[in-house]
């Protein structure tokens, strides 16, 4: 009779400790992926497009 409450308490303690399978899979994928896989290089076309989008209207406004 004493085993049942002990079993229930152990079951309640063990349930939150179980890892989320999706979370562990994402974490393992992130660990395996290196920074070179993340494409951290800045694309020059993006920067030039942003600068052109900002500078051209600014120069047009200054010139009149």
Swiss-Prot record:
It is found in: Secreted. Residues 1-19 form the signal peptide. The keyword Signal applies. Residues 20-43 form a propeptide. GO terms for cellular component: extracellular region. GO terms for molecular function: toxin activity. The modification Methionine amide is found at residue 63. Its main location: secreted. Expressed by the venom duct. Belongs to the conotoxin T superfamily. The mature peptide does not contain cysteine residue. This is Conotoxin VnMLCL-042.
């Amino acid at each position: 009779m004493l085993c049942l409450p002990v079993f229930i308490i152990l079951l309640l303690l063990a349930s939150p400790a179980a890892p989320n399978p999706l979370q562990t899979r994402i974490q393992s994928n992130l660990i395996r992926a290196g920074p070179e896989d993340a494409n951290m290089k800045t694309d020059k076309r993006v920067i030039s497009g942003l600068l052109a989008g900002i500078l051209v209207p600014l120069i047009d406004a200054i010139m009149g």
